[in-house]
Protein backbone atom coordinates (compact mmCIF):
# COMPACT_ATOMS: atom_id res chain seq x y z
CA UNK A 1 0.00 0.00 0.00
CA UNK A 2 1.41 3.38 -1.06
CA UNK A 3 1.20 5.72 1.91
CA UNK A 4 3.02 8.67 0.37
CA UNK A 5 1.35 12.05 0.26
CA UNK A 6 -0.44 12.72 -3.03
CA UNK A 7 0.91 15.88 -4.66
CA UNK A 8 -1.67 18.63 -5.07
CA UNK A 9 -1.16 18.54 -8.82
CA UNK A 10 -2.38 14.94 -8.79
CA UNK A 11 -5.51 15.68 -6.77
CA UNK A 12 -8.62 13.88 -7.95
CA UNK A 13 -10.59 15.89 -10.54
CA UNK A 14 -13.93 16.56 -8.92
CA UNK A 15 -15.94 16.50 -12.13
CA UNK A 16 -14.97 12.89 -12.92
CA UNK A 17 -14.48 11.37 -9.48
CA UNK A 18 -15.50 7.75 -9.14
CA UNK A 19 -15.88 5.24 -6.35
CA UNK A 20 -12.30 3.97 -6.49
CA UNK A 21 -10.91 7.49 -6.32
CA UNK A 22 -13.12 8.30 -3.34
CA UNK A 23 -12.13 5.09 -1.55
CA UNK A 24 -8.47 6.00 -2.00
CA UNK A 25 -9.04 9.30 -0.20
CA UNK A 26 -10.75 8.01 2.92
CA UNK A 27 -9.34 7.35 6.37
CA UNK A 28 -12.43 5.94 8.08
CA UNK A 29 -12.48 7.40 11.60
CA UNK A 30 -13.32 5.10 14.53
CA UNK A 31 -12.33 7.40 17.36
CA UNK A 32 -15.28 8.20 19.59
CA UNK A 33 -14.44 7.31 23.20
CA UNK A 34 -17.81 5.68 23.90
CA UNK A 35 -17.54 3.03 21.18
CA UNK A 36 -17.77 -0.54 22.48
CA UNK A 37 -15.82 -3.42 20.94
CA UNK A 38 -19.02 -4.40 19.12
CA UNK A 39 -19.32 -0.86 17.75
CA UNK A 40 -15.68 -0.87 16.68
CA UNK A 41 -16.04 -4.23 14.94
CA UNK A 42 -19.10 -3.01 13.04
CA UNK A 43 -17.12 0.00 11.81
CA UNK A 44 -14.10 -2.12 10.88
CA UNK A 45 -16.33 -4.46 8.91
CA UNK A 46 -17.97 -1.50 7.17
CA UNK A 47 -14.57 -0.12 6.21
CA UNK A 48 -13.60 -3.49 4.76
CA UNK A 49 -16.89 -3.83 2.89
CA UNK A 50 -16.51 -0.39 1.33
CA UNK A 51 -12.77 -0.92 0.68
CA UNK A 52 -11.63 2.46 1.95
CA UNK A 53 -7.94 3.34 2.05
CA UNK A 54 -7.61 2.98 5.80
CA UNK A 55 -9.18 3.21 9.20
CA UNK A 56 -8.00 5.56 11.93
CA UNK A 57 -8.66 3.94 15.29
CA UNK A 58 -8.02 4.65 18.96
CA UNK A 59 -4.53 3.56 20.07
CA UNK A 60 -5.87 0.72 22.19
CA UNK A 61 -7.72 -0.69 19.19
CA UNK A 62 -4.77 -0.91 16.80
CA UNK A 63 -3.74 -4.50 17.44
CA UNK A 64 -7.33 -5.74 17.22
CA UNK A 65 -8.02 -3.73 14.07
CA UNK A 66 -4.89 -5.05 12.36
CA UNK A 67 -5.99 -8.61 13.06
CA UNK A 68 -9.60 -8.07 12.01
CA UNK A 69 -8.67 -6.29 8.78
CA UNK A 70 -5.85 -8.64 7.80
CA UNK A 71 -6.14 -9.52 4.13
CA UNK A 72 -8.68 -6.81 3.31
CA UNK A 73 -6.24 -4.24 1.94
CA UNK A 74 -7.48 -1.65 4.45
CA UNK A 75 -4.65 -0.02 6.38
CA UNK A 76 -4.79 0.72 10.10
CA UNK A 77 -3.69 4.12 11.37
CA UNK A 78 -4.04 5.65 14.79
CA UNK A 79 -3.85 8.91 16.71
CA UNK A 80 -1.10 10.23 18.98
CA UNK A 81 -1.54 12.79 21.76
CA UNK A 82 -5.23 12.75 20.94
CA UNK A 83 -7.36 14.80 21.11
CA UNK A 84 -5.72 17.74 22.91
CA UNK A 85 -2.03 17.45 22.02
CA UNK A 86 -1.13 18.24 25.62
CA UNK A 87 0.84 15.12 26.50
CA UNK A 88 4.59 15.48 26.71
CA UNK A 89 6.78 14.81 23.71
CA UNK A 90 8.20 11.76 25.50
CA UNK A 91 4.68 10.41 25.98
CA UNK A 92 3.88 10.99 22.30
CA UNK A 93 7.03 9.13 21.30
CA UNK A 94 6.18 6.21 23.60
CA UNK A 95 2.64 6.11 22.26
CA UNK A 96 3.98 6.15 18.70
CA UNK A 97 6.38 3.27 19.33
CA UNK A 98 3.61 1.19 20.87
CA UNK A 99 1.29 1.92 17.95
CA UNK A 100 3.96 0.89 15.46
CA UNK A 101 4.65 -2.30 17.42
CA UNK A 102 0.93 -3.05 17.28
CA UNK A 103 0.92 -2.66 13.49
CA UNK A 104 -0.17 0.92 12.77
CA UNK A 105 0.92 2.05 9.31
CA UNK A 106 0.25 5.77 9.74
CA UNK A 107 0.23 8.11 12.76
CA UNK A 108 -1.98 11.19 13.14
CA UNK A 109 -0.42 13.24 15.94
CA UNK A 110 -1.95 16.33 17.55
CA UNK A 111 0.44 19.25 17.64
CA UNK A 112 1.22 20.93 20.94
CA UNK A 113 -1.75 23.29 20.69
CA UNK A 114 -0.76 25.32 23.74
CA UNK A 115 2.71 25.91 22.32
CA UNK A 116 1.17 26.91 19.00
CA UNK A 117 -1.17 29.39 20.67
CA UNK A 118 1.85 30.76 22.56
CA UNK A 119 3.75 31.27 19.31
CA UNK A 120 6.46 28.83 20.40
CA UNK A 121 6.96 27.33 16.96
CA UNK A 122 10.36 25.84 17.82
CA UNK A 123 8.67 23.75 20.50
CA UNK A 124 5.93 22.71 18.07
CA UNK A 125 8.55 21.70 15.52
CA UNK A 126 10.60 19.73 18.07
CA UNK A 127 7.48 17.86 19.18
CA UNK A 128 6.71 16.88 15.59
CA UNK A 129 10.32 15.97 14.82
CA UNK A 130 10.52 13.63 17.80
CA UNK A 131 7.49 11.66 16.62
CA UNK A 132 8.68 11.66 13.01
CA UNK A 133 12.08 10.34 14.08
CA UNK A 134 10.46 7.64 16.21
CA UNK A 135 8.20 6.70 13.32
CA UNK A 136 11.14 6.29 10.94
CA UNK A 137 9.58 5.75 7.48
CA UNK A 138 6.00 5.68 8.74
CA UNK A 139 3.73 8.49 7.52
CA UNK A 140 3.08 11.10 10.21
CA UNK A 141 0.21 13.55 9.89
CA UNK A 142 0.10 16.59 12.16
CA UNK A 143 -3.32 17.71 13.39
CA UNK A 144 -3.38 21.48 13.78
CA UNK A 145 -6.87 21.79 15.32
CA UNK A 146 -7.71 24.73 13.07
CA UNK A 147 -10.85 25.60 15.06
CA UNK A 148 -8.50 27.09 17.67
CA UNK A 149 -6.16 28.80 15.20
CA UNK A 150 -6.08 32.18 13.51
CA UNK A 151 -5.15 32.14 9.84
CA UNK A 152 -1.63 33.30 10.72
CA UNK A 153 -1.35 30.46 13.23
CA UNK A 154 -2.57 27.94 10.64
CA UNK A 155 0.22 29.10 8.33
CA UNK A 156 2.86 29.01 11.07
CA UNK A 157 1.70 25.62 12.36
CA UNK A 158 1.74 24.17 8.85
CA UNK A 159 5.29 25.42 8.35
CA UNK A 160 6.38 23.99 11.70
CA UNK A 161 4.87 20.61 10.84
CA UNK A 162 6.66 20.46 7.50
CA UNK A 163 9.93 21.61 9.09
CA UNK A 164 9.49 18.80 11.62
CA UNK A 165 9.26 16.25 8.83
CA UNK A 166 5.51 15.63 8.66
CA UNK A 167 4.13 13.98 5.53
CA UNK A 168 0.71 15.60 6.00
CA UNK A 169 -0.92 18.48 7.77
CA UNK A 170 -4.45 17.81 9.00
CA UNK A 171 -7.20 20.19 10.02
CA UNK A 172 -8.95 18.72 13.03
CA UNK A 173 -9.53 16.03 15.60
CA UNK A 174 -13.28 16.28 15.16
CA UNK A 175 -13.64 16.97 18.89
CA UNK A 176 -13.00 20.72 19.07
CA UNK A 177 -16.39 22.07 18.03
CA UNK A 178 -15.25 22.84 14.52
CA UNK A 179 -13.97 20.75 11.65
CA UNK A 180 -12.47 21.21 8.22
CA UNK A 181 -13.32 24.21 6.08
CA UNK A 182 -12.42 24.78 2.45
CA UNK A 183 -10.80 28.06 3.44
CA UNK A 184 -8.43 26.36 5.87
CA UNK A 185 -7.64 23.61 3.36
CA UNK A 186 -6.71 26.22 0.74
CA UNK A 187 -4.55 28.08 3.23
CA UNK A 188 -2.78 24.91 4.31
CA UNK A 189 -2.24 23.82 0.70
CA UNK A 190 -0.84 27.22 -0.26
CA UNK A 191 1.50 27.06 2.73
CA UNK A 192 2.88 23.54 2.38
CA UNK A 193 3.06 23.42 -1.41
CA UNK A 194 2.50 20.41 -3.68
CA UNK A 195 4.68 17.81 -1.98
CA UNK A 196 3.00 17.59 1.44
CA UNK A 197 -0.37 15.96 1.96
CA UNK A 198 -3.33 17.88 3.35
CA UNK A 199 -6.02 15.97 5.25
CA UNK A 200 -9.51 17.35 5.83
CA UNK A 201 -11.18 15.90 8.88
CA UNK A 202 -14.13 16.81 11.04
CA UNK A 203 -17.50 17.57 9.47
CA UNK A 204 -16.96 15.78 6.14
CA UNK A 205 -20.25 13.91 6.13
CA UNK A 206 -21.35 13.91 2.49
CA UNK A 207 -20.00 13.68 -1.05
CA UNK A 208 -20.45 17.37 -1.82
CA UNK A 209 -18.35 18.33 1.18
CA UNK A 210 -15.69 15.78 0.24
CA UNK A 211 -15.54 17.19 -3.30
CA UNK A 212 -15.29 20.72 -1.94
CA UNK A 213 -12.32 19.72 0.22
CA UNK A 214 -10.57 17.97 -2.67
CA UNK A 215 -11.11 20.99 -4.90
CA UNK A 216 -9.56 23.15 -2.18
CA UNK A 217 -6.45 20.95 -2.05
CA UNK A 218 -7.13 18.02 0.29
CA UNK A 219 -5.48 14.74 -0.62
CA UNK A 220 -6.92 12.70 2.24
CA UNK A 221 -10.29 12.78 4.01
CA UNK A 222 -11.01 11.73 7.59
CA UNK A 223 -14.65 10.78 8.12
CA UNK A 224 -16.88 8.26 9.83
CA UNK A 225 -19.51 8.76 7.10
CA UNK A 226 -17.67 6.62 4.55
CA UNK A 227 -20.67 4.43 3.77
CA UNK A 228 -22.93 7.40 3.20
CA UNK A 229 -20.38 9.09 0.94
CA UNK A 230 -19.73 5.99 -1.15
CA UNK A 231 -23.43 5.21 -1.37
CA UNK A 232 -23.87 8.74 -2.70
CA UNK A 233 -21.19 8.10 -5.33
CA UNK A 234 -23.04 4.97 -6.44
CA UNK A 235 -26.39 6.80 -6.47
CA UNK A 236 -25.08 9.63 -8.61
CA UNK A 237 -23.32 7.23 -10.94
CA UNK A 238 -26.50 5.23 -11.54
CA UNK A 239 -29.03 8.08 -11.65
CA UNK A 240 -27.06 11.22 -12.44
CA UNK A 241 -28.84 12.95 -9.57
CA UNK A 242 -27.90 13.91 -6.05
CA UNK A 243 -29.35 11.84 -3.24
CA UNK A 244 -32.11 13.31 -1.12
CA UNK A 245 -30.48 11.93 2.02
CA UNK A 246 -29.51 14.71 4.42
CA UNK A 247 -26.19 15.10 6.17
CA UNK A 248 -25.50 12.72 9.03
CA UNK A 249 -24.78 15.20 11.79
CA UNK A 250 -23.69 12.46 14.19
CA UNK A 251 -20.61 11.55 12.19
CA UNK A 252 -17.00 12.58 12.76
Language-model features, listed with the residues they occupy:
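Short beta-strand scaffold positions
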Residues: 56-57
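Short, charged, intrinsically disordered terminal tails
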Residues: 239-242, 246-247
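N-terminal acidic, proline/glycine-rich, low-complexity intrinsically disordered segments
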Residues: 1-8
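Alpha/beta enzyme core
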Residues: 13-50, 60-198, 206-228, 236-239, ...
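Short hydrophobic "strand-cap" motifs at the C-terminus of beta-strands
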Residues: 201
Amino acid sequence: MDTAATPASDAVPTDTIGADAVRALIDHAILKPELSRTDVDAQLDEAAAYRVFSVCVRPGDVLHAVERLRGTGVGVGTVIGFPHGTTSTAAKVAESLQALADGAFELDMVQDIGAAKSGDWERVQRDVRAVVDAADDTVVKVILETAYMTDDEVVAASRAAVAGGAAFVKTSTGFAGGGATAEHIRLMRETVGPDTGVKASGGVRGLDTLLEMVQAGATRIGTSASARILDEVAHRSSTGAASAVGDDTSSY
